[in-house]
């Protein structure tokens, strides 16, 4: 009897499966469901000309159908593809995305892009870098006359004649540097995070370029920002200037990296408390100078992220030949 019961249950299951399959066949294909259009615009606002990445890969089709992507800009120009780049000039612009499946289903999403005109007397310089593995961007407005004034200052080529600290404390660019530092400060939540963020900026957004022959002189921060590149002293001056603008202590240091007792490199030093030091990646590389614990900030990394406190030179206190504190 038990065998018969088992066979009966199996037979019933088979009949049910056949019935469901037959019902589906009788009813025909299920009705198509419309896709959902969605996209990201990065950045969504900035100074013109503003180049924006439009990414529609967040769009979805509930039936799993393949999608096509059609873009319309200000009800005029168009483009296609899941990811497109578009440059917008001054004004507010409307971007429309239409996604379609292969069975006639469609959906539309729209966003506005605000491209702000650059104020007269300024130039806009955009920067891109990575901080703790996350891509970052910003655009700084640079007063053109102030930049030209710094660029036009007469200098000589004798490196030993330079007081590098003078390039940090010059007062004319203080309000401008304070604005730039304020942008970074608003993106962080502590002094430690701000220092890390500013260091990542100068390492990643400012290309390392040795001074050309017969041009061995430092640059003021605005010169480095306009060029987007600089030698070790240029990036260190910029970094220390950003910290100074927010009242964060630091120093420029002229150091000996090859043990010949002659200065050959400029970097920054940041005084750190014992708890801060314990949180650093390279806490064993700290320098003690006059009883103060300093973390090395190597700004001329040529794009390589070197965390605060990591000393690529293996410096000792005797290798620090001159310091300009701020």
Language-model-derived ranges and their functions:
Residues 55-63:
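Acidic, Ser/Thr
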Residues 32-36:
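Proline-centered linker/hinge motifs at extracellular inter-domain junctions
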Residues 100-105:
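Short, solvent-exposed loop/turn segments at the edges of extracellular beta-sandwich modules
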Residues 158-227:
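Secondary-structure boundary elements
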Residues 234-326:
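Hydrophobic/aromatic-rich core segments of domains that either
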Residues 68-86:
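Surface-exposed, flexible coil segments in extracellular/virion-facing regions
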Residues 109-116:
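C-terminal edge beta-strand
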């Amino acid at each position: 009897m038990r065998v018969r019961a088992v066979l009966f249950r199996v037979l019933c299951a088979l009949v049910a499966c056949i019935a469901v399959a037959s019902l589906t066949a009788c009813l025909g294909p299920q009705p198509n469901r419309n896709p959902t259009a969605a996209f990201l615009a990065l950045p969504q606002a900035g100074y013109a000309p503003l180049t924006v990445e439009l990414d529609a890969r967040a769009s979805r089709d509930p039936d799993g159908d393949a999608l096509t992507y059609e873009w319309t800009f200000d009800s005029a120009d168009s483009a296609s593809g899941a990811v497109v780049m578009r440059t917008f000039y001054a004004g507010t612009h409307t971007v429309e995305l239409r996604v379609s499946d292969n069975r006639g289903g469609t959906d539309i999403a729209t966003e506005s892009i605000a491209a702000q005109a650059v104020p007269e007397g300024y130039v806009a310089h955009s920067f891109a870098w990575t901080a703790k593995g996350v891509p970052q961007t910003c655009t700084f407005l640079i007063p053109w006359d102030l930049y030209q004034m710094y660029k036009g200052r007469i200098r000589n080529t004798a490196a030993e004649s330079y007081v590098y600290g003078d390039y940090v404390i010059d007062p004319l660019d203080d309000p401008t540097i304070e604005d730039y530092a304020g942008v970074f400060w608003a993106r962080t939540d502590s002094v430690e995070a701000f220092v890390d963020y500013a260091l990542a900026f100068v390492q990643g957004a400012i290309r390392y370029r040795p001074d050309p022959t017969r041009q061995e002189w430092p640059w003021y921060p605005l010169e480095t920002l306009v060029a987007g590149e600089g030698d070790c002293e240029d990036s260190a001056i910029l970094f220390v200037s950003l910290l100074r603008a927010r009242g964060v202590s630091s120093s420029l240091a002229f150091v000996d990296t090859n043990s010949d007792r002659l200065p050959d490199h400029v970097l920054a030093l940041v005084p750190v408390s014992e708890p801060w030091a314990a949180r650093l990646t390279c806490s064993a590389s700290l320098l003690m100078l006059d009883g103060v614990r300093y973390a090395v900030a190597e700004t001329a990394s040529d794009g390589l992220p070197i965390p605060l406190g990591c000393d690529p030179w293996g410096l000792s206190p005797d290798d620090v030949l001159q310091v300009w504190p701020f």
